[in-house]
Amino acid sequence: MALCVGLTVAGTAIAEVGYPEKEDLKFGFIKLTDMAPLAIAYEKGFFEDEGLYVTLEAQANWKVLLDRVIDGELDGAHMLAGQPLGATIGFGTQSHIITAFSMDLNGNGITVSNAIWDKMKKYVPRKDGKPVHPIKADYLKPVVAEYKKKGKPFKMGMVFPVSTHNYELRYWLAAGGINPGYYAPHKGDITGQIKADALLSVTPPPQMPATMEAGTIFGYCVGEPWNQQAVFKGIGVPVITDYEIWKDNPEKVFGVSKKWADKYPNTHIHVIKALIRAAKWLDENNNKNRPEAVKILSKSQYVGADYEVIANSMTGTFEYEKGDKREVPDFNVFFRYFATYPYYSDAIWYLTQMRRWGQIADQKPDSWYMDIAKKVYRPDIYAIAAKELIAEGKMKAEDFPDFDKEDGFRAPQKHFIDNVVYDGTKPNAYLKKFKIGLKGDDKI
C-alpha cells in the first residue's frame, strides 16, 4: 500500500537551503526493520516539516527497487550499501547512484535450519548449558565437509549479490575455513559459486524462512525480522549476528541517482534532514522510542510482521536458540556512533569485498577505491543538511562528526570475528591479510 503525506511549509528551513525543486516524492523500501528512518520521517511529520509530500512504497525485491530508481519511477530508496557502489562500477546494471545518508549499523543475522544446528552444535563450546558466543563457522566446517563427502551441495541464501548479507556470510564462512566461492563477470559467470565449498544464492528477505523450511537452502543471512521469524516458527536457529562478525558495520543507505540529485539539490538536502531527525528519534534517550517504532513497523504497509517478532531485536535483545534470549543493545543502531554519516571507509570496505570475491575481476590501485568512494558517498551533502538542523536548533553540533576536521575515514577497525584489522586508506594491503579470497593480481 502506498502512503501519501501532506505538508506545512517550514519557512526557516526552506529559506536557508532553498525551496525543494520537487515536492511530490516516491521512495521505495524492502520490508525490513531497518527501513525505519523512512517510516518514522513519514509518521512523525519530519518530511512535512521540510515541505515534502512523500509516498512510501514497498518493493518486491532489491533488483526491482534499484531498477526503479535508475528508471526514475522512484525518487530514491532504502538500499543495500553495496547497491550504489555496484551500480556505479557496473556490476549488474550500470548507473551512477549516490548516497548522502547511511540508514543504520548492524541489524543482520545468520540462521541455520534445525537439522544443520543439530549437526553443528556438538562442535560448539558450552558454558552453563548454553553455547559460547560468538559461534564461528569453524563449527559448521565439519558439517559442510560431511555434505561434500556424500556428494551433496551445501546451500545457503543471501539477499542480493552486492548485499551486506552476502559479504557478511562470506566473511564468516571464510573466517572458518569454508570457501564461499568466486564470481567471474569477465567470463559471464555471476553465480558466485566457482570453487565454492558452500553454494550461496539469492532469496528475497521475506521468503527466507519458507525457503529454508522447504529444504531449498540450509541456512541464510538476512535482516530482521526474518531471523527471529525462524525462531518463532520453530524452524531454525540464528547462530550469529553481524555485530559479532564486524562490530558496528554499516548496513543500508538511502540512495538516489546522481542525475536526480543534480536536478533536485535542495530537495535532496531536505530529504536528508528529515531522515537525520528520524534516525535521532529512533535512538534517543537509550532507545525509549523503540516500542512505538515497533508498533509503527508492524503495520502491513511497512514490515507487516508481528509486534513480538520485530520487538525481539529492535528493543535490544536477540533470541538465538528458542528461549536463549540475550542482550544485544546495539543490534539495531540508527544514530549512535555517527551511524548516519556516509564514511568513505565504509564504501571502500564494500569495494574490497567485491574484489575479494571476484565481482571486481582485476586488481585496482588504492587510488581507484578512493575515487569510487568519493563518486558514490557524499558527506558534503550530508554536512549541509546537518548544519541546517544545527542552525534551526533541532540538533546539536556534538550529534555529528566535526565537519572541519572529518576526512571521511573511520579509525582502523579491529572488531572483526577473525581479528583482521581494517584500515580504509590501505585497501590492497587489507586484502592481502586474507587466506581465502582474491588479492593482488589474482584472477579467476
List where the protein language model places each region.
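Conserved C-terminal helix/tail region of periplasmic/extracytoplasmic solute-binding proteins
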Residues: 348-444
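Short glycine- and hydrophobic/aromatic-rich loop-to-beta-strand nucleating segment
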Residues: 110-111, 253-256, 260-261
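N-terminal signal peptide c-region/cleavage motif recognized by signal peptidases
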Residues: 10-12
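Soluble non-cytosolic domains of exported or imported proteins
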Residues: 32, 59-63, 78, 159-163, ...
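Short, glycine-/small- and polar/acidic-enriched structural segments
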Residues: 16-195, 199-203, 211-248, 418
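Short, well-ordered alpha-helical packing segments
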Residues: 170, 227, 231, 255, ...
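Secondary-structure end/capping motifs
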Residues: 263-379
